[in-house]
């Protein structure tokens, strides 16, 4: 007889969180705020942090997103709930009523995941429930001085949940033991589960035959420890241009990022259903921007790996100038493994499945083979502005001797003119160092001067290709009101950052400029699009 198991991955932490008293929940709110993103999910009101329980309903053809949610304030606080939203295309989201809530105001339903129990191993379902909609949530129940792993099941496809009467299903007598991720291991016909044991900085991997009774199989610990581990994820990722795959362990740290605050790291290796063994001890980051944390993947995805993250940073998330909501998610990304300089590296890209035909192209600028000089910049001349743009640029670096300090070009994201001023952020490339960078400092705007809001970040990249002896690079970017996602060299490196222009201002046009008098950069292809939801 084949033993059916669930695999659970849990990190084992030390943080103090504030308390906010309960009040009535009112989701009716004006959503016309000038800097609210259009296609990055934001709650209508209140506070959001980690995405939870991502899954795809194959029967309803619907994506489900749950998230850490405080509807009573725009800062973290208990009682904490699982908020809920759905989408049929990953960019147009409908927010629903709270999915799971705590029993008392000084408690919280902390992060977790959802598994579709097709085979009814839990015994929660009968034949009237579609196998694709047998939804079981496993989450951390945060009560005073204790964190346990509890489960709840849904009989209506994930909109409402009933808590298991014999909770908790895992209790290790710790107040820093959370963020369970459950997944079905097809090869071993098993469910696996992991959690973070924060205080001891390790990931614990459990197995179960019924989602109710769990056995500890192994521990994992590596990489940047930071102050705590959290939000661990273990998933099989395909290798590009092959029929092979490798297992990848994702885990988050906070604080402890080299950039400050929170970040996600990953490890490539093998998993036998019980233990994860990395290929090496090297630390790699999922996204090198300042605002990409608590990464989650969708379960029940038919092809490939699709995931998103919380687009903020614990260093300043509760201070950003948005109202009546705080925080957004990143866009969903497709993940693969690619050999880069003979080493497997995680790559991320947004493709047509994430930016579907339902996104309206309002206007477009398209150019080819432009030799960029200080007398020949590129500028959009779009008639209106939605604050939502994307751009795709492939360029090569010409072999010229240029003056020191004149080895770069910049992409300026400019606001509309308001009160006789224009706010800008810039992305650029320095050919002398093979370095992409972003500068999100905006003079005369208060928030970007916050102590921990690192305004300048950079990334060294090897060329994507060579044209004879000339280096070739590519950059795709998407700008959505107050967030920019950058994908360098076909997704070899991703960088996500929020930015905040002055009151009433948001992105209006894009310029590509350089200081060089002679052409150092040939822009082989430039496509800039103004988009609308």
From Swiss-Prot:
* Enzyme Commission number(s): 3.2.1.26
Q: Which GO terms describe its biological process?
A: sucrose catabolic process
Name the enzyme's class: hydrolase
Write out the catalysed reaction.
Hydrolysis of terminal non-reducing beta-D-fructofuranoside residues in beta-D-fructofuranosides
Instruction: Quote the record's binding site residues for substrate.
Output: 47-50, 68, 110-111, 178-179, 314
**Active site annotation, chain numbering:** 50
Q: Which GO terms describe its cellular component?
A: extracellular region; fungal-type vacuole
Glycosylation positions?
A: 72, 119-120, 126, 219, 334, 392, 419
Q: Which PROSITE patterns match?
A: GLYCOSYL_HYDROL_F32
Superkingdom classification of source = Eukaryota
- Is Acetylation one of the keywords UniProt gives this record? no
Q: Which residues form the signal peptide?
A: 1-22
A Pfam family this chain is assigned to: Glyco_hydro_32N
Gene3D superfamilies in the cross-refs? Exo-inulinase, domain 1 (2.60.120.560), Glycosyl hydrolase domain, family 43 (2.115.10.20)
What's a Gene Ontology MF term here? sucrose alpha-glucosidase activity
Q: Which UniProt keywords apply?
A: Glycoprotein, Glycosidase, Hydrolase, Signal
User: Which protein family is it in?
Assistant: Belongs to the glycosyl hydrolase 32 family.
Protein name (record): Invertase
Instruction: Write the gene name.
Output: INV
């Amino acid at each position: 007889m084949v033993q059916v198991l669930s695999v659970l991955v849990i990190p084992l932490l030390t943080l103090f969180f504030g308390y906010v008293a309960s009040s009535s929940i009112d989701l009716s709110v004006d959503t016309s705020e000038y800097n609210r993103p259009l296609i990055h999910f934001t709650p209508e009101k209140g506070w959001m942090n980690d995405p939870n329980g991502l899954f795809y309903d194959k029967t309803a053809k619907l994506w489900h997103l749950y998230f850490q949610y405080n509807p009573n304030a725009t800062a973290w606080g208990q009682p904490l709930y699982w908020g809920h939203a759905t989408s049929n295309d990953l960019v147009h989201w409908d927010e629903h009523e709270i999915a799971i809530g705590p029993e008392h105001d000084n408690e919280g339903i902390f992060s977790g995941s959802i598994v579709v129990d097709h085979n009814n191993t839990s015994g929660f379902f009968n034949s009237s429930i579609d196998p694709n909609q047998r939804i079981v949530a496993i989450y951390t129940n945060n009560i005073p001085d204790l964190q346990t792993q509890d489960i709840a099941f849904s009989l209506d496809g994930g909109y409402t949940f009933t808590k298991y009467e014999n909770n908790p299903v895992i209790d290790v007598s710790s107040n820093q033991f959370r963020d369970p991720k459950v997944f079905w291991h097809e090869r071993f016909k098993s469910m696996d589960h992991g959690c973070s044991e924060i205080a001891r900085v390790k990931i614990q991997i459990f197995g179960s035959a019924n989602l109710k009774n769990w056995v500890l199989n192994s521990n994992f610990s590596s990489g940047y420890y930071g102050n705590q581990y959290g939000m661990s994820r273990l998933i099989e990722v395909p290798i590009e241009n092959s029929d092979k795959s490798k297992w990848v362990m994702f885990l988050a740290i906070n604080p402890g990022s080299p950039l400050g605050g929170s970040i996600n790291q990953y490890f490539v290796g093998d998993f036998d259903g019980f233990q994860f063994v990395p290929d090496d001890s090297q630390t790699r980051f999922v996204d090198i921007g300042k605002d990409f944390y608590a990464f989650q993947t969708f379960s029940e995805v038919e092809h490939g790996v699709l995931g998103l993250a919380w687009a903020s940073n614990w260093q300043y998330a509760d201070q950003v100038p948005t109202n009546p909501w705080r925080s957004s998610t990143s866009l969903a990304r497709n993940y693969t493994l690619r050999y880069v300089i003979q080493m497997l590296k995680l790559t991320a890209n947004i493709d047509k499945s994430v930016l579907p035909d339902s996104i309206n192209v309002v206007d477009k600028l398209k150019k080819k083979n432009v030799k960029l000089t200080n007398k020949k910049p590129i500028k959009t001349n779009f008639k209106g502005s939605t604050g939502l743009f994307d751009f795709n640029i492939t360029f090569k670096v010409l072999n010229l001797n240029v003056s020191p300090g004149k080895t770069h070009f910049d992409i300026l994201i400019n606001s509309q003119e308001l009160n006789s001023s224009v706010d800008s952020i810039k992305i650029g490339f320095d050919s002398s160092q093979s370095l992409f960078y972003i500068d999100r400092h905006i003079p005369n705007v208060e928030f970007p001067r916050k102590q921990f809001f690192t305004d300048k970040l950079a990334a060294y990249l090897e060329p994507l290709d060579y044209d004879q002896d000339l280096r070739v690079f590519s950059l795709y970017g998407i700008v959505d009101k107050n967030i920019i996602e950058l994908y360098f060299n076909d997704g070899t490196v991703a960088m996500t950052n929020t930015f905040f222009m002055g009151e009433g201002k948001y992105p209006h046009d894009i310029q590509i400029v350089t200081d060089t008098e002679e052409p150092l950069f040939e822009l082989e292809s430039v496509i800039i699009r103004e988009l609308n939801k």
